Regions:
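Beta1/beta-strand and adjacent pyrophosphate-binding region of the FAD-binding site
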Residues: 1-15, 32
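Flavin-dependent oxidoreductases
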Residues: 18, 177-250
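Gly/Ala-rich phosphate-binding loop of Rossmann-like dinucleotide-binding domains
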Residues: 20, 24-25, 160
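Glycine-rich FAD pyrophosphate-binding loop
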Residues: 24-45
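Short loop/edge segments at beta-strand edges and connector loops
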Residues: 35, 120-121, 170-172
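Dinucleotide-binding Rossmann-like beta1-alpha1 core, especially the glycine-rich loop
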Residues: 49-127, 247
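A short, glycine/Asx- and small/polar-enriched loop/turn
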Residues: 97, 128-136, 178-186
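Helical element adjacent to the flavin cofactor pocket in flavoenzyme catalytic cores
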Residues: 140-198, 202, 206
Length: 250
């Protein structure tokens, strides 16, 4: 590990590796990522990996579309599988108000170039044969949505970053960050200090701790989410074994 880099990325999850990948793609090859344990050992490893294109914001929607497009070509670029499944996404509406929201979104989707369909209960039943559609008004269907394996994606981004000149060091905990009078930054680790122009924190659950190293109190806290794993469902098992396409994400 060198003692001087242009940029130091702190955190080895999907955000950190993506940032390093894109820095190197932009010509900042003299960049390094530091991870205190192993890649994906934070919140990335147990993320659901869903890729929702739906967003009412034009700017965020563009990022979503870019991400989905990137994930589909990343395996070809790096040779590292990302386990991308383009099985689509169904957003169900039980009220006319919800369908109106989806119609408002259609303008954003059309501007960004995101394929979508506003469909009724009969079409929902065709896409999801096991759905009870009696109380549904309709749905927003994104055929290009799907899901990805977060760990595989992280490894592909890391490989892509290395292919473009980036460096990654695991088991390298950042213990301090300070700024010099000439505006350079010094990042302290158990393996020694690194001087750089820019430090980017991608530490997820540890964002507050990282912020405190530079005198910032970031209003970031971990939030509990539900992740339910069911037992085998005979109808779905028969459907999958019958060679049918993967059902859309609901």
């Amino acid at each position: 590990m060198k003692t001087q880099y242009r940029a130091v990325v702190v955190g080895g999850g999907v955000v950190g590796t993506s940032l390093l990948y894109h820095l190197c793609k932009m010509g900042w090859e003299d960049s390094v990522l530091l991870e205190k344990l192993e890649l994906t050992s934070g919140s990335t490893w147990h993320a659901a990996g869903l890729l929702p294109l739906f967003n009412m914001s034009y700017s965020v929607g563009k990022i979503h579309k870019y991400s989905v497009d990137l994930y589909q070509k990343l395996e070809e670029e790096t040779g590292q599988p990302v386990s991308f499944h383009k099985n689509g996404n169904l957003r169900l509406a039980r009220s006319q108000e919800r369908m109106d929201e989806y119609r408002r979104y259609s303008g954003t989707a059309s501007t960004i170039g995101v394929p979508y369909h506003l469909i009724g209960p009969e079409e929902i039943k065709k896409l999801w044969p096991f759905a009870e559609v009696g109380d549904l008004v309709g749905a927003l269907y994104h055929p290009d949505d799907g899901h990805v394996a977060p760990v595989d994606l992280t490894m592909a981004l890391a490989k892509g970053a290395r292919m473009n000149g980036g460096e990654i060091y695991t088991q390298t905990e950042v213990t301090g960050i300070r700024q010099k009078p000439n505006d350079e930054w010094v990042v302290s680790t158990a393996q020694g200090d690194i001087t750089c122009e820019v430090v980017i924190s991608c530490t997820g659950n540890y964002a507050r701790e990282t912020g405190r190293m530079v005198g910032l109190e970031l209003p970031v806290v971990p939030v509990e989410h539900q992740y339910i794993v069911t037992g085998a469902i005979p109808e779905l098992a028969d459907y999958n074994q019958g060679g049918n396409p993967e059902l859309a994400v609901l």
